[in-house]
Amino acid sequence: MKISGCENASRSGDVIFVHGLGGNAWSTWHPKELYDDNFWLTWLGKDFLDLGIWSFGYAAEAFEWKGTSMPLFDQASNLLDWLEICDIGQRPLIFVAHSLGGLLVKKMLNTAQTFSKQAVSEQTKGIVFLATPHTGSHLAKLIDNIGILARTTVSVDELKAHAPQLRELNEWYRENVPSLGIATKVYYEMQPTQGILVVDPDSANPGLQRVKPVAISDNHISICKPKSQESQVYLGVKKFIQEYLRTPLELPPSDSTSTTVRNFTKVAEKALVINQVEGISAELTPIEKKILRLVMNL
């Protein structure tokens, strides 16, 4: 999804947002009580007029009755192809990734090197991880426990805590970050979501030297939805972009207009599955109902 500045052929760089499990290109980043173009992706577009701001959407549902998902390897190939189609990788770029999205970005960079498509990895100057479970999440196991009543997707299976493929991916990232020259910024949640800490501090830490994860007093859902331009996450991401894309902050002209494409599919999806949720909930224990409500709001 094109947010701002993407049609500018002379732009100096790109910033790509990548959502996580159960999210989409719009609702993951947008406060739920607001339904307009005034949110932090467009704020960044106004702060950095010479950058393209993008949001990548992909199928990453937790339950099969909500939709489909693909293995991380296939999602990574899909993201790499999308970047090539949009001519992203010809300029310096930064990724901002939430939860599963952070694993997807790491796997995409790994895939780019494996298949000799190194332009993207060479142009990647930094990654901001927002509550990314580098070694998996115990929530995935809890979700899987109710799989008899609500079949889970492959994305849930791959997110289980201490999964071997996640450890291997994180080891690859740690070993290759110095040679790739990729700066890393890490934020992690401190508040539970529906009583569950989705990504604990240990899993949120990729284990990089000179990278200190920053605790944020938000939950797994709200950490990626800054409500103001004075929020810590927004200011931190803005400074990170300015530093690693080496672009000056600019003020928008008074007559500037947003080029954001609205996407409210998440609201429609929830309306369509409400009957299914009620049917499933009748057969769940209290803790399983809590987990189901959590996943519905990711």
Name each model-derived stretch.
Residues 2-50:
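Short, surface-exposed "cap/lid" segments of acyl-processing enzymes
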Residues 8-10, 47-48, 118-123, 176-180:
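Short, conserved loop/helix-junction motifs that constitute active-site signature segments
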Residues 12-13, 90-93, 182:
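Short coil/turn segments at beta-strand junctions that form active-site/ligand-binding loops
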Residues 28-30, 66-68, 137-144, 195-201, ...:
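Short aromatic-enriched loop/helix-cap "lid" or pocket-rim segments at secondary-structure transitions
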